[in-house]
Amino acid sequence: PPRSTLFPYTTLFRSMIKLARRLGVSSLHVTFPTEAEWKRLGKHGLLLRTGQQFHWHNRGYESFDDFLADLNSRKRKAIRKERAAVAKHGLHIRALSGADITEAHWDAFYRFYRGTSDKKWGASYLNREFFSLLGERMGESVVLIIAEDGDRPVAGALNLAGRDTLFGRNWGSEADYKFLHFEACYYQAIDYAIAHRLEWVEAGAQGPHKVQRGYLPRLTYSAHWIADPGLKSAVERFIASERREIDYQMKMILARSPFRRDQC
């Protein structure tokens, strides 16, 4: 890039490190930069780390069936079977945004969120007011998938829509409906992305169950400045080892891609 475009980055990165030293903090961390920003951070002495998340890519699909057509027959049949099983529950599932999301919806989703977070992590870091403020200040970016049994909300998945990406955030359910998690979190997100011509759905980390549903591994990036030389050296060795393992995992996962070979 021209030197003029690099100047703001250089100034920002140097200022960040200078501030970290002045404050006497032990470390400084930059998470989820773009690949280009990540490489520039490395030139300023930060340790470069890669991670792995599972994302769905919209290849110009006009419908969910278009997406299914790119999968091998076994995975295609499995997804259709899962969606049919959810349909048999008789639930009403819809995607809500903006003014369509009421306080009653947020009350229900907060219950779902608490049920999941308390069960998995033992504590909920978001309070009820947060969700009202989210709807008030970012309502048009919120995509709330709500599943209702009659008039009663029973499950929900919270997403945020960006310029070209739908970001999956939280999920919860008050009842056990087979395959509903996959429907609400993955298939409904794909439906929404296709309808709104979004290029990506980011479903986050942890992924063998996501891969067979069309979400493939994609590298994420972070950069780390560590004040103590000894600790920095140890972390650098760990990152190198971890990167080799991530590269290996990605190759193994992609070798078992659900997509037809002519689509990989």
For the regions a protein language model found, what residue spans apply to each?
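In a subset of proteins, long, contiguous C-terminal domains/tails are tracked
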Residues: A227, L231-C264
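Conserved acyl-CoA
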Residues: R14-G24, A184-E199
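A donor-sugar binding/catalytic signature common to diverse glycosyltransferases
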Residues: L198-Q206, V211-Q212
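Short functional hotspots where side chains directly engage DNA or cofactors
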Residues: Q212, Y221-A223
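Short, small-residue-biased leader/transition segments that mark boundaries at the very start
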Residues: P1, T5-L12
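Alpha-helix N-cap/helix-initiation motif
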Residues: P1, E174-E183, E199
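A conserved beta-strand-loop-helix scaffold within acyl/acetyltransferase catalytic domains
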Residues: R14-F179, H224-W225, A240, S257-C264
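Short loop/turn microsegments at loop-to-beta-strand junctions
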Residues: R3, S141-I145, V201
